[in-house]
Amino acid sequence: MGRITTDLLRRRAEHNEGCLSNLKEVALHQQDIERIELIGDACRELEILYLCNNYISRIEGLQHLKYLKYLNLAVNNITYIEGLEGCEALERLDLTLNFVADVTCVERLRANAFLDQLHLTGNPCTKVAGYRAYVVHALPQLRELDGEEVIKTERLEARQSKDDISVAVNEEALRLQKRSVSSQRWLHEALTAFPPRYNEKGERLYGHTPEERLQMLREKEEEERRKREEQRERERSSQFGAIREELERKPQRLTAEEEIAKHGRLLLRNEPKLPFTLDEEADDGEAVVLTVKVPRFLSTTLIDVQVEVNYIRVFVKEKLIQVPLSQEVAPSGVNVQRSSVNGELRIRIPYAPHVLQEVSEARRRRQRLLGLLSDDKNEDGTG
């Protein structure tokens, strides 16, 4: 089962530097997705969304997409139109080749005042007598239905015959409701209305129903899992399988405590290989300043900074820069800035109070010593 994750969204948002908060368009077609999730919360400025050729059975989780103009859900398992009332700017909706059978559900789209293009080609509801007239009358804002322009005379005819059409459509909706209850009873009794079918060559045949599409997906996933297991077993049984597995295993990143326990100290690390400088005498010896040359156009959402009393960790696209410190600092006083000119990252951390006190005492001792030396020179000169 494919799922919509933050990682998937960022990979599909490479044209926007992986930033999701201001993403305008994203394509998630052919990802074996069964449920819409995360998009409505992570990408609230989305205007164009492609979810075609998946296994989505319900329209949900899109109520926060106030700027969404085009939604493509063609070739999925959707049986009912719902969940789009919050998409105030929606102009185009494509539900081609789904399983919407109850044409009355199009009335849920009345709230979408700007909707002027609707595609329902290939859905069972298009075979209902009076389908087009019913939709044209139910959605007066429509300019185009199933790729054909809605003309004024067609709208007038639909209005005149609305009573007869409504009777036929409601009767069909009632039949569909009874059929749905029957299907639920089959499922409750753990029976299948779609037993496996094979042709004369013994090849598996599938029908065009939501259940059989999902069954096809499950069988494909099981076949892929079985092939991976067989491949893994072959590699494991080969002479150099164990060695190859050890070499290909990604090293686990150690925590600071684990690194000290293993090496006796913290190591300097630069996994992203970015230039950086460390100034431990900044502000007249009162603070530490770490400057990292981060690429100018890299999104700030891909940068994370962690400061502890004796080290600084900077994660750039999940790659670690670790800088041990010779003196303890005060993490609560950290100040992080990013240059809008060249993207440079500047981290300033003041030293811990006891370190500042030691620095101050050392400075006073140095000044007294310099004062005594100056007095001795003056006495030698007068003598």
UniProtKB/Swiss-Prot annotation:
Major location (coarse): cytoplasm
Cited PROSITE patterns: LRR
SMART domains in the record: LRR_SD22, LRRcap
Keyword terms of this UniProt record: Cell cycle, Cell projection, Cilium, Coiled coil, Cytoplasm, Cytoskeleton, Developmental protein, Flagellum, Leucine-rich repeat, Repeat
Keyword Coiled coil belongs to the record: yes
InterPro entries for the chain: CS_DNAAF11_C (IPR056496), Leu-rich_rpt (IPR001611), LRR_dom_sf (IPR032675), U2A'_phosphoprotein32A_C (IPR003603)
Coiled coil: 211-239
Tree of life domain: Eukaryota
Segments for region (Disordered): 201-244
Tagged with keyword Zinc-finger: no
Compartments reported by the entry: Cytoplasm, Cytoskeleton; Cytoplasm, Cytoskeleton, Flagellum basal body
Single GO BP term: centriole replication
Annotated Gene Ontology cellular component terms: ciliary basal body; cytoplasm; cytoskeleton; cytosol; extracellular region; motile cilium
Domain LRRCT: 128-146
The LRR repeat ranges on this chain: 20-45, 46-66, 67-89, 90-110
Pfam families the UniProt entry points to: CS_DNAAF11_C, LRR_9
Family: Belongs to the tilB family.
Function noted in UniProt: Involved in the regulation of the cell cycle; is required for the basal body replication and new flagellum biogenesis.
Name of the molecule in the record: Dynein axonemal assembly factor 11
Gene designation per UniProt: dnaaf11
